[in-house]
């Protein structure tokens, strides 16, 4: 049996509040390359898939709420490994960064999370955003207060120097001691991983301290290697993202 990870494309997941659900009539794509199952039936009990078949071979128990998926595709929820909930439909970073931070937590980040869910994404990594807002939005999703995928949040970018006006979501490091302290703060706050950017501007000692301190707190480190010079040899083989 599997924990439920299905999402109906173009269909709200709000119906899953019921304990016993039967999804009936859709085309099931299992994500493993097998042939689609037409006229599928999926029985869900307390968020656990207990049976999968077709209209012809599964009888839906009377106590199940039937949700028609006829004409729809049903598939496993998707993962998006690199998102920024604070960025939504814009191209002018300078304008965005000074205009909209006050709307991040209550408007923009929840809206971005909802859009991901409606696109079929049920889990995502947010790799750079304001610390408090990121964790609050993650926790609101987890508690069912707002719709969205399961979010894994890095909080602020960690870099040598934040760009002017971006200090809310970009944290600079100045020396090995400061690098370790920044990671301790993030770990204590409850981030799920650490995000590096512009690490070619750091000393190797600063970079090594970040990775080492992150590992002490069982946090993975993801590096944004968008320039050839950023393809460092990792200070630790545990983070292939830095290779």
Q: Which residues does each PLM region occupy?
A:
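Bacterial Sec-dependent N-terminal signal peptides
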Residues: 1-19
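Divalent metal-coordination and catalytic microenvironments
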Residues: 26, 42, 47, 71, ...
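Histidine-rich, glycine-flanked metal-binding segment
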Residues: 28, 32-75
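Metal-associated gating/positioning segment near the N- to mid-region
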Residues: 73-140, 164, 205, 226, ...
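Divalent metal-dependent hydrolysis catalytic cores, especially in the metallo-beta-lactamase
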Residues: 109-132, 149-156, 188-199, 220, ...
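Alpha-helix-loop-beta-strand connector modules within alpha/beta enzyme cores
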Residues: 147-149, 207-223
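Active-site gating/metal-coordination segments in enzymes
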Residues: 162-212
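Single conserved hydrophobic/aromatic residue that forms the stacking wall/gate
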Residues: 232-243
């Amino acid at each position: 049996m599997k924990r439920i990870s299905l999402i109906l494309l173009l269909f709200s997941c709000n119906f899953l509040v019921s304990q016993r659900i039967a999804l009936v009539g859709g085309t099931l794509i299992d994500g493993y390359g097998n042939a689609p199952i037409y006229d599928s039936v999926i029985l869900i009990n307390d968020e656990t898939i207990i049976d999968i078949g077709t209209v012809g071979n599964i009888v839906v128990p009377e106590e199940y709420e039937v949700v028609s998926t006829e004409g729809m595709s049903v598939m496993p929820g998707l993962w998006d490994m690199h998102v920024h909930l604070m960025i939504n439909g814009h191209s002018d970073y300078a304008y965005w960064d000074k205009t909209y931070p006050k709307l991040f937590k209550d408007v923009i980040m929840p809206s971005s999370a909802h859009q991901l869910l409606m696109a079929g994404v049920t889990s995502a990594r947010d790799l750079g955003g304001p610390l408090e807002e990121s964790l609050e939005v993650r926790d609101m999703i987890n508690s069912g207060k707002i719709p969205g995928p399961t979010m894994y949040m890095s909080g602020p970018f960690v870099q040598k120097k934040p760009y002017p006006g971006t200090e809310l979501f970009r944290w600079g490091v100045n020396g090995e001691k400061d690098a370790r302290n920044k990671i301790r703060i993030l770990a204590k706050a409850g981030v799920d991983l650490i995000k590096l950017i512009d690490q070619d501007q750091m000393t190797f000692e600063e970079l090594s301290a970040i990775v080492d301190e992150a590992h002490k707190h069982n946090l993975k480190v993801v590096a944004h290697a968008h320039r050839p010079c950023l393809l460092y040899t990792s200070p630790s083989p545990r983070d292939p993202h830095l290779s």
